[in-house]
Amino acid sequence: MESIFHEKQEGSLCAQHCLNNLLQGEYFSPVELSSIAHQLDEEERMRMAEGGVTSEDYRTFLQQPSGNMDDSGFFSIQVISNALKVWGLELILFNSPEYQRLRIDPINERSFICNYKEHWFTVRKLGKQWFNLNSLLTGPELISDTYLALFLAQLQQEGYSIFVVKGDLPDCEADQLLQMIRVQQMHRPKLIGEELAQLKEQRVHKTDLERVLEANDGSGMLDEDEEDLQRALALSRQEIDMEDEEADLRRAIQLSMQGSSRNISQDMTQTSGTNLTSEELRKRREAYFEKQQQKQQQQQQQQQQGDLSGQSSHPCERPATSSGALGSDLGDAMSEEDMLQAAVTMSLETVRNDLKTEGKK
């Protein structure tokens, strides 16, 4: 199918597309067809002038526009016919009595030119298969042999004029290639207008879909951005809270250290105050020691008296030691322990008294 030459519609140049698709190449241009149209106009003018240039018919003919071409690109059947004569080709009306009497099967022909109003297109046999080369189609349309007659009959019912092309067409690559192979067409080509409408509809649908997707993507991005922002704010708050807690902890430690230093200084002050009354403390200790010694001496005397009364009752028993030595040893032993205990006790009492005095202040 790629080897088949197929010109698509441009403007109203369907006559040009029809001829080039028939001949399978860029054989004619609008300028060449316009030149043929001007020649036909001049031939018609000369025939009209034969009746007199002053006649009413001649003046009317000159005032009328050309019947062989117009500014849109339309060309008449006469222009097409004269263009084909250059290649030795002739056009015969398909439904004319002369052709119908020949009873030729359409599949035995080589090509047809179809016209409806101002549109022209070609149906041609390439190799062993028929193709509709209408320039309004997006590509060549394969026509089976059995469908060809029905296709032509349908065109006639729709008002088309069908012309049979007689003569030898120029050789072309597509004809040579399709002589050896047959092609299959899975999808029929669409009309250019239908394809453009479909493409436009697809573009509109795609645009709408893209807008929806962009809107969704945008909202999704906004949602993601909001989530990221919330996450960042939460982390920031956590960091601030942690910083506040750390600051509070540092502040508490600092205050604790300051309090400890104050307590230490107060203790040092109290200790220094205690040192100032050490003489008084020494006197208290001596008085306490003397009181304890007096108690111990009284206890020793009472014990000696008990021993003497016992000796008078038992004259055979002798004391192991003298009472003076025993009292001295006990006094010495008691004095060392009691002195240590008394010192500790008095120190504690002194500290308590100082604390009470400080508290009252």
Swiss-Prot record:
Region of interest: Disordered: 258-338
Limits of the UIM domain: 224-243, 244-263, 331-349
EC numbers on record: 3.4.19.12
InterPro entries, A to Z: Ataxin-3 (IPR033865), Josephin (IPR006155), UIM_dom (IPR003903)
A Gene Ontology biological process term: protein K48-linked deubiquitination
The protein's enzyme class: hydrolase
Membrane topology reported for the UniProt record: Peripheral membrane protein
Main localization category: nucleus
Entry's free-text remark on domains: The UIM domains bind ubiquitin and interact with various E3 ubiquitin-protein ligase, such as STUB1/CHIP. They are essential to limit the length of ubiquitin chains. The poly-Gln domain is involved in the interaction with BECN1 and subsequent starvation-induced autophagy.
Protein name as catalogued: Ataxin-3
